[in-house]
Amino acid sequence: MTWDVDATLAQIRRLADAGCEIVRVAVPDDKSADALADIVKGSPLPVVADIHFTWKLGLKAIAAGVHKVRINPGNIGGESRVREIVAAARDRGIPIRVGANAGSLPKEIIAKYGVHDPAGIVEAALIPIRILEKEGFEDIVVSMKASDVGLAVASYRLAARRIPYPLHIGITEAGSAKRGSIKSAVGLGMLLEEGIGDTMRVSLTADPVEEIEAAYMILSAVGLRQRGPEVISCPSCGRCDIDLIGLATTVEERVRALGTKIPLKIAVMGCEVNGPGEARDADVGIAGGLHEGLIFKKGEILRKVKEATIVDDLMVEVEKVLRDKEAEAAAAAAAKPGTGA
């Protein structure tokens, strides 16, 4: 619960450690709103207040010092209420996120468009946007979420053509960790490849830290951002003479335990066919064999090792590469103007 300041801040710190850059907290009641000032003060991340139904909670959240407020045009109330939130946000110099959701569209939108029309979702967002613009307020972020991937993608594509404000993208109510990650990867991956999206969230019914991990995996997969090492591995087949599944899992765990944020590609391959050749772009990797394996670096074989020590031998090379990359990063930082001694 948001009103539990200690628990909320503990979760925010975990998210920050995982790489989260903005955090949104639900503000369902006055007790939660009253806790916001302490949460904002103790949070290492910008705090966004998520407001539904009770517009006065938005005013309390803004007064508490939140960095952004999110309102839902489907349930926040009439134009006069939106105007009051705008006035408070302008006084504080914070943006407003307009969040249209396919599951809570205004009645007049449903009557005109139904519930599965991207035009209806975009129009639901445009209604409060026009009110904000009429008040001369343009510090706006827009989202239009749906749990249906196709509907969400089509809505964001239409919004990108019609709305001149930053877009926060996501697939809402995506599901459990596995299903939700797949749905989010499909939908957000398409949008990101098209250059659509300024901020993003992967919504999962899971530990929220898993949302951050999934988001970085999606960003890495489309070549936008990479945070920390990436372990790639091939599917097992009849050529594989090693416990590839167990090997890949162990390597993932060992690499995660390093806690490094340095980008690094590590390959775990089942045989010489998929080894140094197909994974030649990996910084370092292993290719399994019968009771043995090959350690390779950028496609070049370094040495043959025993199966019993293959993970330890790989990690030795991983740590060498990390040290080299750390030294390169330090040298590059020192060479920048104003950073030298």
Where do the PLM segments sit?
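Active-site mouth loops of central-metabolism enzymes
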Residues: 1-7, 26-28, 45-53, 109-122, ...
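Hydrophobic or amphipathic alpha-helical targeting/insertion segments
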Residues: 45, 56-97
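Catalytic alpha/beta core domains of metabolic enzymes, predominantly
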Residues: 101, 109-256, 261
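Alpha-helix-loop-beta-strand connector modules within alpha/beta enzyme cores
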Residues: 30-51, 84-96, 156-167, 251-256
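Catalytic beta/alpha-barrel core
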Residues: 22-29, 46-53, 69-77, 121, ...
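Glycine-rich tight-turn/loop motif centered on a GG-T
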Residues: 63-77, 81, 108-120, 301-304
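Conserved, mostly hydrophobic/aromatic
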Residues: 50, 98, 142, 191, ...
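N-terminal active-site wall of soluble small-molecule enzyme domains
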Residues: 7-15, 27-64
